[in-house]
């Protein structure tokens, strides 16, 4: 495993992600007609948990990838589904989720950092998102922001190589170095209507569709980490059980609680 290189040296597990896609690790959130398996959130959580048993950062990038695919799958944009979903499901296209600021701003935790202006054939986007993960020059991601003069939200696909858009690597993280978490600068970035997942009049219903699964799917990271912690407790118990037996929570207790939660 490349865990040390990923965590300490910032190695991005791109080769693994693309190989995982070929094995179907991202296919659960994509319908069969677009190259997925259609197995749903439960399959996505299971795949993510398996990865998380070894590397939580890589499990996080799996969540980013599947969240991106799911946002597109749950939109009404048939052309975008046909264009992007087969490649996202197979790992040929990698993608991120840039909706943290959108969701937090809807809850008045943050202010919106992007603005959209309606122009002929699409929208013009300006602003900066400080943290978006699982990105690269040939990646895509989904984000959302209010439209000037309207106030309602616009959700759309961003291609990292498009004019006016810039990725900035200006931060160092304790545990996210290998996740390609970058700042995203928008300077009059043109988003065509063909890249819009929800126009303002569609945004309330669209947000209700995507938000529950976006949160629920993150369980996969936690489950994988807990499994690995139990493994470490078992391993330590082979030499230190005479001391560890006094801990309030034993491996079997945690195993039972996890099994109940997964059931």
Write out the residue ranges for each language-model feature.
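Buried hydrophobic positions in well-ordered alpha/beta secondary-structure cores of metabolic enzymes
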Residues: 47, 125-127, 156, 186, ...
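Short Gly/Thr-rich strand-loop-strand
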Residues: 102, 113, 169-176
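Long, low-complexity C-terminal extensions of enzymes
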Residues: 261-263
């Amino acid at each position: 495993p490349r865990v040390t290189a990923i965590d300490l040296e910032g190695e991005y597990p791109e080769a693994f992600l693309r190989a995982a896609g070929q094995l179907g690790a991202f296919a659960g959130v994509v319908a069969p007609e677009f190259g997925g398996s259609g197995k749903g959130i439960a399959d996505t959580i299971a795949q993510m948990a398996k990865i998380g048993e070894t590397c939580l950062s890589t499990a996080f990038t799996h969540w980013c990838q599947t969240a991106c695919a799911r946002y597109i799958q749950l939109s009404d944009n048939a052309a975008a589904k046909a264009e992007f979903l087969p490649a996202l499901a197979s790992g040929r296209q990698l993608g991120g989720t840039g909706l943290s600021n959108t969701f937090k701003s809807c809850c008045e935790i943050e202010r919106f950092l992007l603005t959209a202006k309606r122009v002929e054939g699409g929208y013009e986007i300006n602003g900066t998102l400080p943290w978006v993960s699982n990105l690269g020059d040939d990646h895509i991601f989904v984000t959302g922001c209010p439209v000037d003069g309207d106030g309602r939200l616009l959700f759309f696909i961003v291609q990292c190589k498009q004019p006016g858009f810039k990725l900035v690597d200006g931060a160092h993280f304790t545990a996210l170095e290998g996740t390609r978490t970058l700042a995203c600068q928008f300077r009059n970035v043109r988003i065509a209507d063909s890249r819009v997942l929800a126009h303002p009049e569609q945004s309330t219903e669209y947000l209700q569709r995507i938000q529950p699964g976006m949160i629920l799917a993150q369980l996969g990271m936690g489950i994988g980490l807990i499994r690995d912690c139990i493994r470490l407790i078992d391993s330590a118990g082979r030499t230190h059980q005479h001391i560890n037996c006094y801990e309030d929570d034993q491996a079997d207790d945690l195993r039972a609680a996890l099994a109940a939660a997964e059931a």
